[in-house]
Amino acid sequence: IQSTNMDQQGSLTEDSMNSFIRTLIQAGIWKNKVPKQTARAKDDTQTTVKKTEAEADAVASKEARLGFQPIVSVDAELLRQQRRFSSPRVLLSENTPLEPPPLYLTEQPVALNRTSRRKREGKSHRGEYSVCDSESRWVTDKSSAVDIRGHQVTVLGEIRMGPS
């Protein structure tokens, strides 16, 4: 951690305290998590540097008065709070889509050029593309198919969710 600037009287300025807080948060260091830094003196004795701890305690007492709760580490809970994820091909979201995919041929116009990816007609979302280029329509009259490993599988016409 780099040392912070001090004004002429020896007290921390507000800007330097803010930058120090940011440095602590970015480094994942706060209150009890401040490591004791040791420095070797020329005569091979170790001296504990307590300046960082004193500055952290001063900032912590000020922030406690303001009701500030620092973020110590980034964990899975913080990542779960993100509602939108980034993908170049599709929009990933925890929410269900506004409209279901078309189930019948009449609901979706047949594309003339099957090799190009095109956005769905009508109301669409950013990055919403067809998953498969080789098939441009929904197949609803199949009872069996071949999976990607070459095995024969049964196609379900309806999937029931919840208690039966």
Curated annotation (Swiss-Prot):
Residues 1-3 form the signal peptide. GO terms for biological process: cell surface receptor protein tyrosine kinase signaling pathway; modulation of chemical synaptic transmission; negative regulation of neuron apoptotic process; nerve development; nerve growth factor signaling pathway; neuron projection morphogenesis. Glycans are attached at residue 113. Residues 4-120 form a propeptide. One of its GO terms (molecular function) is growth factor activity. It holds the Pfam family NTF3_N. Keywords: Cleavage on pair of basic residues, Glycoprotein, Growth factor, Secreted, Signal. InterPro entries: Cystine-knot_cytokine (IPR029034), Nerve_growth_factor-like (IPR020408), Nerve_growth_factor-rel (IPR002072), Neurotrophin-3 (IPR015578), NTF3_N (IPR045815). SUPFAM superfamilies: Cystine-knot cytokines. It is found in: Secreted. GO terms for cellular component: axon; dendrite; extracellular space; synaptic vesicle. Belongs to the NGF-beta family. Seems to promote the survival of visceral and proprioceptive sensory neurons. This is Neurotrophin-3. It comes from Sanzinia madagascariensis. The gene is NTF3.
